[in-house]
Amino acid sequence: MKTLKRKTGIIKIVSISFIILFASAVLGACAKNEIIDEQNTKDNLPTPDLPYTIVGTNQLSCFDNTKEISAPSVGEEFYGQNALYNENQGSYTDNTDGTITDNITGLMWQKNAGDKMTYDEAVNGASSFDLSGYTDWRLPTIKELYSLIIFSGIDPSGYNGSSTTGLIPFIDTDYFDFEYGNPNDDKRIIDSQFATSSLDVGDSNFGGGNLMFGVNFADGRIKGYPTGAMPGQPEGKTFFVLYVRGNQNYGINEFVENSNATITDNATGLMWTKDDSGTGMNWQQALEYAEGKEFAGYSDWRLPNIKELQSIVDYLRSPGSSNSAAIDPVFNCTEITNEGGQKDYPYYWSGTTHANMQNGGNAAYISFGRALGYFNGSWQDVHGAGAQRSDPKVGDATNWPTGHGPQGDAIRINNFVRLVRNVN
């Protein structure tokens, strides 16, 4: 009995100690939460309803295969394009201290990119960057930076003038400072590439390899850019940089595979088809395919806009590194043989027109396989799996046997489709 009492006494002491420790932990956690809440309030950063809300493209005009048109009605040609599904348009707050808050994503941005810097300078500069009293800035991922792109811009590629008057960039200049490349400094007008922390994991040797996915807000594209000096060049390429802070969950998917061959992304609120179209088609056919599709009990499928489509890219996967498309393996991607004779994966259409100086003849796509170009006499992955470029909406791809543009981008026209719908 004495032993039992002694043990009971020990248990009581331990229990009291545990209660004190537990209470201290709870109080500490509450205090920590209060500090976090106080910090969030001080930062005035909104908490998004979904951690990875896709910001709209700001594409308000409709297009046919070549030009702007009046908005088509249900059942008419070219119905189903981006401008007819216009949601979550950008909303920013200028904090008047050199920072911009994105009210949709919960991210805070540097307003003015300042001078260009090398990639190493961009990476190393984040830890010492201090703006408006905040020191937790980071170099954005490609998905964070792409949240800023808008497709009310006009691609000036091929423009030979030096004046930027009348040109429209692919970023909201009501809030962000922006400048085109300066031809007087031996730069192209379109040399306005912005750096990210996202590197290409593929097998590209373009520019000596080691590509970084950057956003060009002058011409409205994602491409892989060499992080160091190009072969034969004394210096590496330089980039603009917009550091970011807040919402560290932005760009992280939460895929759930449903039992009906659909995939729900709980981070974005979008549902996708597990399988793609299985065959390529031109842009108008892609719109018709999406609008006419009834699948898994749903009839509200559509062609995704380019920012929705980019949201499901997995930049840690590629044909060269994982022997797969740049997408979570929960999805199925049709295998193709590319222009260079390699096993590869398709380009996928979006409903977003990529307007240029010749109006609306191109639409934006994402390359879930190698972003091929004909460069220095051979087909190679010039921009990396996950690049966003554009193709003519209609035509014969054989008219571009060596691609198009400075890096000879492969023109296919008959691209694949993956359908999307809103969960709610």
Where are these regions (language model features)?
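C-terminal motif of bacterial Sec signal peptides marking the signal peptidase cleavage site
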Residues: 25-29
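Glycine-aromatic-enriched surface loops/turns that form tight recognition elements
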Residues: 30-138, 143-301, 307-424
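Sec-dependent N-terminal signal peptides
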Residues: 9-21
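N-terminal secretory signal peptides that target proteins for export/translocation
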Residues: 1-11
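Compositionally biased, intrinsically disordered low-complexity regions
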Residues: 7, 19, 60-63
